[in-house]
Amino acid sequence: IAENIREVYRYYKQQGWNYQQYIACMDPLYEEHGLNPYSLTSDMYGKFLSELFECWYKDYRRGKQPYIRQFENYIGILLGLPPESCEQQGRCGIQYVVEADGSAYPCDFYMLDEYCLGNFNEHTIDYMDEQRKKIHFQEVSMRFSKECKSCPYIQLCRNGCQRNRVEQADGTYKNYFCDAYRF
């Protein structure tokens, strides 16, 4: 999709799909970013975002743009509104992703045994909230690198999704797609 976003955008519009959300392709958790044949590089993602924005903005000027969550959040941020997307809040929100068996996780990108907060058939929400605190899920998402804190783009980027961050030597995190947001 990243290499053909103009065609994808046109196709989605032809289908009447006016609500769109694009999530960057992620490498497996705990693996170094960019080593798989399908890996999305920061450069590719930056070009993707630029081309998608050009398509969207052209339609916006005609009053016929689809709702694209990321762009709508950017506009809201520029207008002083809080973004609803956790990726653009700069920290993980409090939410529960629940499997059919009742198992609950803090995020759909962290549905692994080590992140299981409990099970709705066996535990209370208070118990699951305590588990979330024990694994420091939200606290870790708020560790920005010094470079990020002083970056002129931090108000828009906010270091992105925790899942796309790379740990720095000082224990803070920097978004793998940082350069893409500066495109």
Name each region found by the language model.
Residues 1-91, 97-100, 111-117:
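Radical SAM enzyme [4Fe-4S]-AdoMet core and its adjacent flexible, acidic
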Residues 86-88, 92, 141, 168:
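Generic marker of residues within folded, mature protein domains
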Residues 111-183:
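Flexible mid-to-C-terminal extensions adjoining Fe-S/redox cofactors in radical SAM and related proteins
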